[in-house]
Amino acid sequence: MQIAEKTVLITGANRGVGEALVKEALNRGAKRVLAGTRGALSNTDPRVTALTLDVTNASQIQRAVDQVADLDVLINNAGIAIHDDLTDLHAIQKHLDVNLLGLLKVTQAFLPLLTRSKGAIVNILSVTSVAPFPVIPGYSISKAAALSLTQSLRALLTRQGVSVHGVILGSVDTDMTRGFDIPKVSPESAAAGIFDGVEEGEEDIFPDPTSRTLVDGWRGGVTKAFERRINAVVLEGAQIDLRERL
């Protein structure tokens, strides 16, 4: 899907990757960018409309829906990462509330508009979706669950004409990764890679050097092969033996 002349909604849009995604959508000719945020928005482009949107707040989600007449692309970018050691269930729940359930609630709320436009859902996931980072296990758990949700949505929404893209994002130089001494890309580079993948129709998008090290193993591996076979059941009603070797 080309971004030019499209209406794009981005959650978590006031800083980091979200802010960069807003700018990149504008650079690619988006007709309108809806910037979902809990804080102030610095972008003054007339094509940008700020939406007060905490993805854990049902009333804010509904108010946002009421303000949007049409939508082509939903980018579920809002997320949190809290240091934990699996001893604090509250920390794990906070990750799930934002990174998993918030994503699902926003998707459900805007799905009628996306179905009408035959649009796209872009879920910002993480390399920790496939390989946990033990320093932030709650984050890794939530992102792994969000990957599974993305795969399920992809199969279930195909018949409605809605494409679902999962972004396997590596480390980006933002507030979220400030305490980690690891290679990072700029938010702008990540945003460009994400939109490249969307415009090229990639189901799973690997937008940075770290995530691209996983490409061959992921796309040619048994996990992706199994996903395709399961999707065949949903799309075609095919009867397959799941015990059969891949």
What is the predicted function of each stretch?
Residues 14-15:
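Conserved glycine-rich cofactor-binding loop
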Residues 45-58:
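Rossmann-fold cofactor-recognition segment
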Residues 50, 95-96:
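A hydrophobic alpha-helix adjacent to the NAD(P)-binding/active-site core of NAD(P)-dependent oxidoreductases
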Residues 79-94, 135-138:
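Conserved mid-core segment of classical short-chain dehydrogenase/reductases
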Residues 96, 107, 142:
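Active-site helix of classical SDR
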Residues 126:
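Residue(s) in the substrate-gating loop at a strand-loop-helix junction
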